[in-house]
Amino acid sequence: MIRAAYVRTCSLGRQLVRPDRAAQLVEFAVSLPLLVLFVVGIFDFSAAFTLKQKLTNVARDAARVAAADPSADVGNLSSGVPSSVIDSLKVVDSYLTANRLNDCGLSTKTPTRSGVTWTYTIAPTGTPPCGITLIINRGYVFPVTSTTPPDARTCLSQTPGSQTALVGTCVSVQYAYAWKFARVASLFGRNDSLPTEIFAVAVALNEN
C-alpha cells in the first residue's frame, strides 16, 4: 500500500514537472530572439557612435590643416588641386589608416570641383560596403553671429545678410556604414530604415 502511494506521488510529481518544463521552453524560445536583438543593438550602435567620434575628430583636424595654409593657393584654379586641399586629404587618409578604417582608395581618387569646393566621392561597394565622400570647401562663408551649424552633407556657405561675413574652411566626411541591427530587427517584422552612412562636419577660420 505504501509502495502504491509512493508510485502515485511520483507519477503526480512528473505530471506537474512536465508543464513547467514546457513553459520554460516556450519562454526561452520567445526570449532568445529578443536577447539576440538586444545584444546586436548594443554592439551595432556602439560601433556607429565610435565611428561618429572618429569622423568628427578627423574632420576637425582636416579643417584646421587646410585653414592654416595660405588662401592664395585657391586663387589659381587652373593649376590643379590646391596644396591646402591635398594636405586636408592626407590628414583624412592617414587618420583612417591609423584607426584601422578602410580608406576605400581615397588617396588615389581625383576630386571634382565647384567654385572653391573639392569633393572626393567613392561609391559604396563590396560587403560590407566601403564608400567615402569627402568635401573640402576652402571658402566657407558664414555670418559672425551664426548659430546655425554647417550642412554636414554639402558644406555650402551660409548667407551673411547684413552681418559681417567670416570665411573659413569646411570639411565634411561621410562614411558608409552597414547596420547589422536592421537585419535582425527585420526578423521581428520591422522594416525601419537606418542611415546608410555616418557623417561629421567641422569648420575652421582661414588664418592666411
Where are these regions (language model features)?
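Glycine-centered recognition micro-motifs in short, flexible terminal segments and loops
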Residues: 9-34
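Short, conserved structural patches
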Residues: 2-10, 57-208
